[in-house]
């Protein structure tokens, strides 16, 4: 297991902590990993390790800068963060800029991936015109308070559970139209019968009807990301 290194930074005076994991040898690229609404968890740390195993530098972002003791607290913190688009995007950009400015990331191409709220976060970076090679959203929310406008720089991959009640088909169709209008280069993978949170085996133990693990969708979505990254990096 690769050792995670704490990286302190801030956003407009709010102290934040990212977590850096580095491969042996020269990284193929630097990948920002945005967590779920619960912020950094063992599941997200495992994803960082999986990226390191494939030769990438991984930097786990921090949404809140404070502990998340339970789901109610996560909902409160997320609502406060996402309630204003400018506030939300500035926090996301602080994470991206911190990774970009790491000495270990000098000269590397940049990508971002995210899960649940993190999936929405990487799409917001793309919408904001950030110069990334790729963004990948796993069971991310697709709505936004500020739709994308050209140019959209990164390649976009969305991996979506078709039975995710948090992202109804109307939202999916609106996202497609938004991406086309912005002339984005996008891929959209939908998995039939699959719920929200399909990449996390712990989803089945949360007692929430909206979420559930799906081993096949988990494998296929990660493979889709790897295929895209292999093409780019």
Q: How would you describe each model-predicted region?
A:
Residues 158-160, 164, 191:
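Short beta-strand/loop motif that positions the catalytic acidic residue
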Residues 114-118, 122:
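Gly/Ala-rich beta-loop-alpha elbow adjacent to hydrolase catalytic centers
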Residues 4-105, 199-214:
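Serine-hydrolase catalytic machinery in alpha/beta-hydrolase-like enzymes
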Residues 163-168, 196:
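Acidic catalytic loop of the alpha/beta-hydrolase fold
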Residues 131-141:
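A conserved short beta-strand
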Residues 103-115:
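Alpha/beta-hydrolase fold nucleophile elbow
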Residues 168-178:
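Short alpha-helix in the alpha/beta-hydrolase fold that links the catalytic acid
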Residues 180, 185-233:
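C-terminal catalytic histidine-bearing segment of alpha/beta-hydrolase fold enzymes
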């Amino acid at each position: 297991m690769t050792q995670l290194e704490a990286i302190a930074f801030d956003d407009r005076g709010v102290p934040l902590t990212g977590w850096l994991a580095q491969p042996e040898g020269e990284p193929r690229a630097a990948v920002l990993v945005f967590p779920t609404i619960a912020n950094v968890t063992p599941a997200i740390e495992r994803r960082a390790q999986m990226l390191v195993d494939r030769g990438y530098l991984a930097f786990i972002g921090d949404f809140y800068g404070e502990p998340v003791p339970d789901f109610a607290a996560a909902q409160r913190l997320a609502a406060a963060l996402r309630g204003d688009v400018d506030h939300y995007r500035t926090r996301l950009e602080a994470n991206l800029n911190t990774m970009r400015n790491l000495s270990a990331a000098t000269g590397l191409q940049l990508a971002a991936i995210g899960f649940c709220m993190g999936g929405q976060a990487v799409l917001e970076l793309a919408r904001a015109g950030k110069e990334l090679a790729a963004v990948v959203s796993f069971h991310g929310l697709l709505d936004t308070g500020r739709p994308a406008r050209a140019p959209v720089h990164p390649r976009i991959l969305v991996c979506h559970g078709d039975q995710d009640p948090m992202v109804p088909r109307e939202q999916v169709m609106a996202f497609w139209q938004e991406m086309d209008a912005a002339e984005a280069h996008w891929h959209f993978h939908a998995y039939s019968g699959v719920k929200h949170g399909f990449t996390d085996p712990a989803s089945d133990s949360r007692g929430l009807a909206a979420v559930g693990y799906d081993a096949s969708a988990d494998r296929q979505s990660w493979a889709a990301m790897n295929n895209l990254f292999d093409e780019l990096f």
